[in-house]
């Protein structure tokens, strides 16, 4: 009985090691496929739309940034 329990424990631990390795392997394959497939299918437009959205966000916050820059310049000129 003791022998079967130890054997079962070793097999179970080996299974955990193998599944962790398999999980890392499959996640690597999925990450690689998610990067390669859009470029093969023609998903290059996503990068353009992403940069467009980024510019829209920058334009949205840009007036506030200009006001802060002017305020900072005014404060710095007072220090000099």
Swiss-Prot record:
Gene Ontology CC, one term: membrane
Propeptide, residue positions: 56-80
Keyword Secreted in record: yes
Tissue specificity: Expressed by the venom gland.
Location in or out of the cell: Secreted; Target cell membrane
Highest taxon listed in the record's lineage: Eukaryota
Signal sequence segment: 1-24
Main location class: secreted
Keyword Ribosomal protein appears in the UniProt entry: no
UniProt similarity note: Belongs to the non-disulfide-bridged peptide (NDBP) superfamily. Medium-length antimicrobial peptide (group 3) family.
Function description: Antimicrobial peptide. Has antifungal activity against all strains tested (MIC=12.5-200 uM). May act by disrupting the integrity of the bacterial cell membrane.
Name under which the protein is recorded: Probable antimicrobial peptide clone Con10
């Amino acid at each position: 009985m003791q022998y079967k329990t130890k054997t079962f424990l070793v097999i179970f631990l080996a299974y955990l090691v193998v599944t962790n390795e398999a999980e890392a392997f499959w996640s690597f394959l999925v990450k690689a496929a998610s990067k390669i497939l859009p470029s093969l299918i023609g998903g290059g437009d996503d990068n353009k739309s992403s940069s467009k959205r980024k510019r829209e966000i920058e334009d949205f916050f840009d007036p506030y940034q200009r006001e802060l820059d002017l305020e900072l310049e005014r404060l710095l000129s007072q220090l000099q």
